[in-house]
Amino acid sequence: MEYNNNNQQSFWQFSDQLRVQTPNLANLSLNDSIWSTNSVFKERRNLDIAATTDKNNNQIDYYQKKTTSDNINSNWNWKSSGSNNDMGLGFGPVGSKSTVDLNPIDKFNSPFNDTWKFNSVNVNVNGYSPSSAVNGDFNKGVYTSMKKYGYNVNLKNNNKNKGIDEDHQIQKGGKKNRKNQQNNNNQRNEDDKNNGLDKRFKTLPPAEALPRNETIGGYIFVCNNDTMEENLKRQLFGLPPRYRDSVRAITPGLPLFLYNYSTHQLHGIYEAASFGGTNIELNAFEDKKCPGESRFPAQVRAITRKVCLPLEEDSFRPILHHYDGPKFRLELSVPEVLSLLDIFADQNP
């Protein structure tokens, strides 16, 4: 312990004498010393080992100039000429050249050069070479920048996997992703449930039906010249199977109209005498290809409320809601029914 203190005290004494007595260094401040990384000293390159060291030459020339005895004091060209394998207990970090048996000038030079001259030690551990990893400018006087070993490096594509922790191969944001996936599953189940309700209560596409929150005010049934007589004789209106769920909204007293697409005329005014349903009369509108089955099973009983002249298309089509070209919606809203009743009243005083 006493030996190390004496060695360190000897070094600092020599350093003080060097600063005061050397003519070219007498005016240097502390910030301009060789131990500082101050950039005011323009010619000095801080520990630029990688840029100035030759693999075949262990000497380090920080000024890239030829050193002679005439300019050694002006350039302070620090060189190391020690052995590559000279590992002693000198001043400086482990692995630096021993300074026990050196004179004061060599003691001052040796720790500065040999401490950072890693290229003289030929060590290669798992592909890591100290000489190749040393950053010459010592990262502006802080630490050397060692090689980054990417644990998750894709050597084939030369890309790192994104969004994954390099040390543990863990997908980042896992909880968030699981939560989003659960929400998506819940939404999908809810949509399936709603679709099931739609299939149960409504078979018509949205364009052909009233909005759910709108009250049905009336209904238009369709016929042709062949079926119109049967409709009036049986006092029973019918529609194809796809309207079975739709006509269930019909209640007794609801205004009804009968459209003949053979003549393109709207007949009225009729009134529902029963609730809408399926196959109220199974033998009505019998299908010749399938005996015992009705071609128009969506049915409702109807009575004549008022005998009126039929309306032409030009008078009633502007009132109705159209979709897919000339097609119009059979479910009528309350304003549509009131408008149709007004037109019938005007043409039949």
Curated annotation (Swiss-Prot):
Disulfide bonds: none annotated. It comes from the Eukaryota. GO terms for biological process: cellular response to hypoxia; regulation of protein catabolic process in the vacuole; response to endoplasmic reticulum stress; response to salt. Contributes to the initial phase of responses to abiotic and biotic stress signals. Binds FYPP3 and facilitates FYPP3 degradation to promote abscisic acid (ABA) response. PANTHER family: DCD DOMAIN-CONTAINING PROTEIN NRP (PTHR46034:SF37), PTHR46034. Highly expressed in sensecent leaves, cauline leaves and sepals. Expressed in the shoot apical meristem, leaf veins, central cylinder, root hair zone, root tips, rosette leaves, flowers and siliques. Residues 157-201 are annotated as: Disordered. Disruption phenotype: Reduced length of primary root and increased sensitivity to salt stress. The lineage of its organism: Eukaryota, Viridiplantae, Streptophyta, Embryophyta, Tracheophyta. This is DCD domain-containing protein NRP. It is found in: Cytoplasm. It comes from Arabidopsis thaliana. The keyword Cytoplasm applies. Residues 214-346 form the DCD domain. Keywords: Cytoplasm, Stress response. The gene is NRP. Residues 188-201 have a biased composition (Basic and acidic residues). Interacts with CRY2 in the cytoplasm. Interacts with Verticillium dahliae PevD1. Interacts with FYPP3. Induction: Induced by touch and salt stress. Induced by wounding, calcium, magnesium and methyl jasmonate. Induced by osmotic stress, cycloheximide and ozone. Induced by abscisic acid (ABA). The keyword Cytoplasm applies. GO terms for cellular component: cytoplasm.
